[in-house]
Swiss-Prot record:
It comes from Human herpesvirus 8 type P (isolate GK18) (HHV-8). Pfam families: Herpes_ORF11 (PF04797). This is Protein ORF11. It comes from the Viruses.
Length: 407
């Protein structure tokens, strides 16, 4: 974080106020609400195309200090086994003149760094730039879980396969399968057929096992009457050459996040950022016109066995050059709309298997019934992608303060 702060400070050397700021003079004002903070610029800002960041902002702990002295919260060393965890989420107001990349902050002591979505030249009047910070509950899955759908097709004869099945102490059958997949002209339809476990061991979800430096070849898992169909991804070659493929997985009754198809297509588990799941475009090759817009669909869906409302915010992947992905909501059991924008003055081709975005999965408390239509709708906060949540159901700073024993 310190290195990023220094980099952004240098980048902001060409981003100044319309009057020269004195040394140590604050750039930001803040208003503290029970469950969120709104910060805004207290001086005019002149942004130039060289800028990649806004001026650094005090940490959440420093902002909250006047209301909650010595406020501290740190989740950077949380247990990796937890399925949900709390973190601060900062994003720009939808009416801002410039767009800001949403960011996840795990520690109240971290200096806040806000990166711009794109290089722009703009004059920002006092109070014209607003950023909202709140505490969200994020959903995190250890490894990749797949939803085991039904396979209604008639199984064909498959090559010899070595199948090993072990029943763990947690009553979850674990499989290790080795063999050469059945191939077809459609490289997305290569698969294994393995013996179905006993009905008492059949579970609705599968948890894949792989090293973080390995590419997991399993694409999806389907349950038939007498078999499991394990679809696998062909090698990333113009003419794939298949060798022995070994995969391991276990069947489980619950999953914090389970996908119909493995989201790590031609990727390793190591590409999984701390908070995000990659969104990889898997459709046909398309051409975006200069400065054009197009909506395509991410051909995947997910579900969760958590007893709460889960949704996802899909945002742009920072490595995209000329194609920008606008924020959108990815709802459970539905494909994700990918709103693409060509930011260049020339046609751009989007190839299959392009890492186009990242999905942040959150628990989104929403107002129900008539409350959504009454005066209480003023308590609604709109997150990036149009996700609307009830701010009264968010974790309050007061509760976080008491939980740390500071009150």
């Amino acid at each position: 974080m310190a290195q990023e702060s220094e980099q952004c400070s240098r980048a902001f050397a060409v981003c100044s106020s319309k009057r020269q700021l004195g040394r140590g003079e604050p750039v930001w004002d803040s208003v503290i609400h029970p469950s969120h903070i709104v910060i805004s610029n207290r001086v005019p800002l002149l942004l130039r195309e060289q800028n990649i960041c806004l001026p650094s902002c005090p940490s959440v702990g420093q902002i909250l200090h006047r209301a909650y002295p010595n406020f501290t919260f740190d989740n950077t060393h949380r247990k990796q086994q937890t399925e949900t965890y709390t973190a601060f989420y900062a994003f720009g107001d939808q009416n801002n003149k410039v767009r800001i990349l949403p960011t996840v902050v795990e520690s109240s002591s971290s200096v806040l760094i806000f990166r711009l979505r794109a290089s722009v030249s703009a004059n920002i009047a006092v109070g014209g730039l607003k950023i909202i910070i709140l505490a969200l509950t994020l959903v995190h899955a250890q490894g990749v879980y797949l939803r085991c759908g039904k396979d209604l097709s008639t199984p064909h004869c498959a090559p010899a396969i070595v199948q090993r099945e072990v029943l763990s102490s947690g009553f979850e059958p674990q499989f290790t399968v080795t063999g050469i997949p059945v191939t077809s002209s459609n490289l997305n339809q290569c698969y294994f057929l393995v013996r179905k476990p006993k009905s008492r061991l059949a579970k609705p979800f599968a948890r894949l096992s792989a090293e973080t430096t390995e590419e997991c070849r399993v694409r999806s898992i389907r349950l038939g009457k007498t078999h499991l169909r394990i679809s696998v991804t062909a090698p990333a070659q113009e003419t794939p050459v298949w060798g022995l493929v070994t995969t391991s997985f276990s069947l489980t009754p619950t999953a914090p996040l389970a996908f119909d198809r493995n989201p790590y297509n031609h990727e390793t588990f190591a590409c999984n950022a701390r908070h995000y799941i990659p969104v990889i475009y898997s459709g046909p090759k398309i051409t975006l016109a200069p400065r054009g817009r197009q909506v395509v669909w991410h051909n995947n869906s997910y579900t969760s066995s958590l007893p709460c409302k889960v949704t996802a915010i899909v945002s742009n992947h920072c490595c995209n050059c000329d194609i920008f992905l606008e924020d959108s909501e990815w709802r459970p059991n539905k494909p994700a709309p990918l709103k693409l924008v060509n930011t260049s003055d020339h046609p751009v081709i989007l190839e299959p298997d392009t890492h186009i975005g990242n999905a942040l999965f959150i628990i989104a408390p929403k107002a129900r019934g008539l409350r959504r239509l009454t005066r209480l709708t003023t308590k609604t906060i709109e997150l990036p992608g149009g996700v609307k949540i009830d701010s009264r159901k968010l974790q309050t700073f007061r509760k976080m303060y008491v939980a740390t024993g500071r009150s």
